[in-house]
Amino acid sequence: MHKHLISLIALLLMLPSLCGAQGTATPYTINHGPYLQGLTYDGVIVCFTTSHKGFSGVEIREKGSQEVHLCRTSKDGLFEADNTLNSISIEGLKPATEYEYRIISKQMLSFEPYKVVFGEEIASDWYAFRTFDPKAEEVTFVVANDIHDDARKCSDLLDLMPMDEAEMVFYNGDIMSHYSREGQPFTSFIDVSVEKFARHKPFAVVRGNHETRGHLARDYGNYIHNTREGRYYGVYYFGTTAVVMLDCGEDKDDEHPVYAGLVDFDRYRAEQAEWLKEVVRSKEFRRAERRIVIVHIPPTVERMAEVEQNAKLVPDLMTWRGNAHLGELLLPILNKADIDVMFSAHLHSHVVFPEQEGVVEFPIIANDNVSAMLVRSSEKGVYVKIVNREGKTTLEQTY
């Protein structure tokens, strides 16, 4: 009797804490996203996370239609499940068409071999987007770079831009200083992007040299889906405009002690160069009337120092493996590809490398780290407007 009494008292003493734990249990939510990636003429990737492990999908319909299709990620006969981070690819869409989508998800409380226990089922609001138009004569997009984990700066730069006009945002590298903390892409720029535009319009991340650093850098591709092929480098087509994204790799030699023998960027850049040769030979690229390249580190060759305004800067840049290797590999290909303009970053200052016959056959605009770029490609050319964080226009020109 005495033992039973002690057990009862102990249970009663535990009840308040048990009830408190039950009362403070966090609800099942979509806690990041959704955000759009890899939008094309006929497909899109919808990304989001849930607060607990679950089984998720995307419902999609043409705007104005009641016919809803459910899309999930399936691999080797298994639907993706018991996870929190989701990237659901949707294909077979119509070009230049408005769609509406929402997230549906069920929490998974238990996942045993022969018994699955589901919990709460949730659904997001409906959000709208439009597939790209293969016949478009004009496209407008925004470029920002070197944000270095400063979400407030990211927000400020986006606020400078007419986001209602832009079809897409390109983040041109060093959006994070390194990737060393779980959830860092969200707090650095994805959450801000979702708030400003990314539920309805996509962004792509052109990696800088800083995103390759940190013990989590190899997981970055779980959050960023620039292309359906799963590469950071790729090409977007907006009707008559082609935009090539190149992945610069690190700025120093692969053998530099700071990398501890863990990087392989010389080979990676050479791989991209072979891919780029195929792109510029393709019918779709040759049909484009305007061609733009985006890469974080500006490719550099010695003869660029012949321009007086860059005579001091170029020799310094040539001491960095990233600049020199990109110049060696990429400029011979791009010089034959009728490129209109290249956008780069990295220098944290505003620099224009002008077109030089036989050296670099197009201007390279290096944006600083406190400005955003508005780019509008049309039959008039490639219009570029750079506005700094104070709202001052520092460059406005058509190429």
Residue ranges and their predicted role:
Residues 1-7:
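Bacterial N-terminal signal peptides that target proteins for export
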Residues 7-17:
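Bacterial N-terminal signal peptides
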Residues 100-128, 187-286, 317, 329-333, ...:
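Extended active-site neighborhood of metal-dependent phosphoesterases/phosphodiesterases
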Residues 111, 149-155, 177-180, 207-216, ...:
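Active-site environment of divalent metal-dependent phosphoester hydrolases
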Residues 140-144, 167-172, 177, 202-207, ...:
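Structural recognition of the beta-strand scaffold that forms the well-ordered cores
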